[in-house]
């Protein structure tokens, strides 16, 4: 189970900290939250603006924009909304954890128990760093649970099976069934499916 109730309690409120467009990510996270009975608070990061800042070499502006988004997230987390679940990109998750650390707090201290996170930076190395340095260790040892996610408009959100140190923090995404089904066909006979394991 990729969103265990223990860490993503039904009825919990969520914070969505990441891009709302041009993709459907915000809608997917918001729907998941509402389907599970909670309210989703959204902080939008515009990836198109981020790309423009990077292309212009305006790294100071980029850092200010990131700080602006993090400050909004902190305001929501401080407002008593009992947020237990979070979606954030890896860079924003790290920035949020560091901002909380500067205040003498942590992601767990503000009540977050489960995190969806996804983005191009998501690697086994980053997952290990996040687990050990940002989330207080593995969830089985009292840390915050994190589910790596990958998605696109056609498929939707695919979650990884639980990521653990024993597997080298390997990330294995599973497409949402039955919406996304993968089939391998014989290139010489496109009407013929290839048997599993062939």
What are these regions (language model features)?
Residues 1-27, 31:
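Conserved adenylate-forming
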Residues 5-9, 34-39, 102:
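Alpha-helix capping at helix-to-loop junctions
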Residues 39-198:
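Active-site glycine/GP-rich loop and adjacent strand/helix microenvironment
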Residues 26-42:
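Conserved short alpha-helical elements in the N-terminal third of ANL/AMP-binding
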Residues 16-19, 35-36, 55:
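Intrinsically disordered, low-complexity segments enriched in small/polar residues
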């Amino acid at each position: 189970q990729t969103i265990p109730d223990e860490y993503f309690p039904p009825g919990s409120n969520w914070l969505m900290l990441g891009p709302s467009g041009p993709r459907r990510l915000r809608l997917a996270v918001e729907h998941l939250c509402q389907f599970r009975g909670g309210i989703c608070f959204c902080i939008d990061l515009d990836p198109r603006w981020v790309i423009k800042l990077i292309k212009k070499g305006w790294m100071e502006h980029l850092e200010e924009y990131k700080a602006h988004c993090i400050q909004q997230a902190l305001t929501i987390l401080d407002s008593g909304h009992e947020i237990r679940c979070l979606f954030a990109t890896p860079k924003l998750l790290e920035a949020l954890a560091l901002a909380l650390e500067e205040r003498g707090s942590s992601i767990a201290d503000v009540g977050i128990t489960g995190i969806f996170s996804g983005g191009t930076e998501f690697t086994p190395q980053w997952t290990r760093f996040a687990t050990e340095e940002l989330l207080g260790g593995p969830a089985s040892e009292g840390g915050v649970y994190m589910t790596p996610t990958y998605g696109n408009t056609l498929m939707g959100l695919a979650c990884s099976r639980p990521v653990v140190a024993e597997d080298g923090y390997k990330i294995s995404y599973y497409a949402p069934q039955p919406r996304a089904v993968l089939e391998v066909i014989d290139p010489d006979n496109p009407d013929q499916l290839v048997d599993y394991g062939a």
